[in-house]
A protein has these predicted regions:
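Internal hydrophobic scaffold segments of catalytic domains
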Residues: 10-16, 20, 24, 95-98, ...
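Glycine-rich, charge-decorated loop segments at or immediately adjacent to ligand/cofactor-binding or catalytic sites
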Residues: 105-130
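Noncatalytic linker/hinge segments flanking ATPase motor cores
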Residues: 48-54, 76-79, 110-119, 140-149
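A conserved mid-domain beta-alpha-beta active-site/ligand-binding segment of alpha/beta enzyme cores
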Residues: 123-174
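Conserved beta-strand-loop-alpha-helix hinge of the TIR/SEFIR fold
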Residues: 63-92, 97-108
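Conserved beta-strand termini and adjacent loop/short-helix elements that scaffold enzyme active sites
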Residues: 37-39, 102, 144
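Conserved N-terminal substructure of TIR/SEFIR domains
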Residues: 1-66, 159-174
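Short, glycine/charged-enriched secondary-structure capping and boundary segments
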Residues: 24-26, 85-88, 114-117
Length: 174
């Protein structure tokens, strides 16, 4: 994602990671039992050219305060924009929100084996220095972009702020 949004007419929604995010929204629209709750719906929408300090950053923080966890899409196209860096630093670093990391480009075996992240997953963390620094401070589950795997992770109370388990819990669902 560009700083903070893509400049084309479609804005952020044209970036590859937002296409994956829109897939989550489509799954929810097609299946009401899909447990995805879109935090962006908890505050009013803002324009891509809104002021960062007075509009975008406060909306992002309000959304995070209303969240039980963070779903982070981490792909070969992910870039650490100002907005993503703020989401990670505030959501993980200050609020302690558990993270569900979704890897659209990786299989279960590339993501990790049981309680240890795999080489490829760790390589993707290099794209987000703020995540790499903070990921061990909260519970996290790592899954491929699969409706079943994401459903499993979202339904797991261990990865919600209300019931979170110990920090640095590397596990994903087979």
């Amino acid at each position: 994602m560009a700083e903070p949004f893509n400049e084309c007419n479609l804005g952020a929604h044209a970036t590859p990671d937002f296409i994956h995010y829109n897939r989550l929204k489509a799954w929810k629209a097609q299946d009401s039992s899909f447990p995805f709750i879109n935090a962006h719906d908890t505050t009013y929408n803002v324009r891509d050219n809104s002021n960062w300090e007075y509009t975008l950053k406060p909306r992002l923080r309000a959304r995070l305060r209303n969240s039980k966890n963070i779903i982070l899409i981490l792909s070969e196209n992910t870039k650490e924009s100002r907005a993503l860096r703020e989401e990670i630093k505030y959501g993980i670093g200050e609020l302690g929100l558990p993270v569900i990391v979704v890897y659209p480009d990786l299989s279960n075996s590339q993501i990790g084996n049981g309680n240890s992240p795999g080489y490829m997953a760790k390589k993707y963390w290099d794209k987000l220095p703020s995540l790499k620094k903070l990921i061990e401070s909260v519970p996290s589950v790592h899954v491929p972009l699969s409706k079943d795997k994401i459903t499993q992770a979202l339904n797991d109370n261990d990865f919600t702020i209300q019931h979170k388990i110990s920090n640095y819990c590397w596990r994903y669902h087979d």
